[in-house]
């Protein structure tokens, strides 16, 4: 009995890397480093703020441009980092292609809608 190894090699060559893994890996690490730095600011902001009233925090602390920009960066980068991580988990553990693609689209839409809602809530002057 002769086994055809050529067919197995062709299958392996055609299902290779899409060459996007290193870029994705780098983005995940960069967003993680940015989140670590933003976490230091967020902890400092939380511990130094003695006001328990959210209205006072919104009126005084979030009027400072640095705090607004830092909070915006923290939320946007954390959602982007979560989107990258969830995509990897979905791609690794969901084998059914239609379900995998649907879940990736749902996660991306959720992150985009959440970012837009946060920006609108942050800058809404109502």
UniProtKB/Swiss-Prot annotation:
Cofactor info, note text: The heme is bound between the two transmembrane subunits.
Membrane topology: Multi-pass membrane protein
Subcellular location as annotated: Cell inner membrane
Residue spans, topological domain Periplasmic: 46-68
GO CC annotations, alphabetized: plasma membrane
Record topology, Cytoplasmic segments: 1-24, 91-100
Subunit-level organization: Part of an enzyme complex containing four subunits: a flavoprotein, an iron-sulfur protein, plus two membrane-anchoring proteins, SdhC and SdhD.
Protein name as annotated: Succinate dehydrogenase hydrophobic membrane anchor subunit
Record gene name: sdhD
């Amino acid at each position: 009995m002769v086994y055809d190894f050529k067919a197995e090699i062709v299958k392996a060559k055609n299902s290779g890397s899409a060459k996007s893994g290193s870029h994705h890996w780098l983005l995940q690490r960069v967003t993680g480093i940015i989140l670590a730095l933003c976490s230091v600011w967020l902890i400092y902001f939380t511990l130094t703020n003695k006001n328990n009233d959210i209205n006072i925090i919104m009126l005084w602390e979030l009027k400072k441009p640095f705090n607004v920009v830092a909070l915006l960066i923290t939320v946007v980068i954390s959602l982007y980092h979560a989107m990258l991580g969830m995509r990897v988990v979905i791609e690794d553990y969901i084998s059914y292609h239609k379900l995998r693609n649907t879940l990736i689209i749902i996660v991306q839409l959720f992150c985009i809608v959440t970012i837009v809602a946060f920006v609108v809530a942050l800058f809404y002057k109502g």
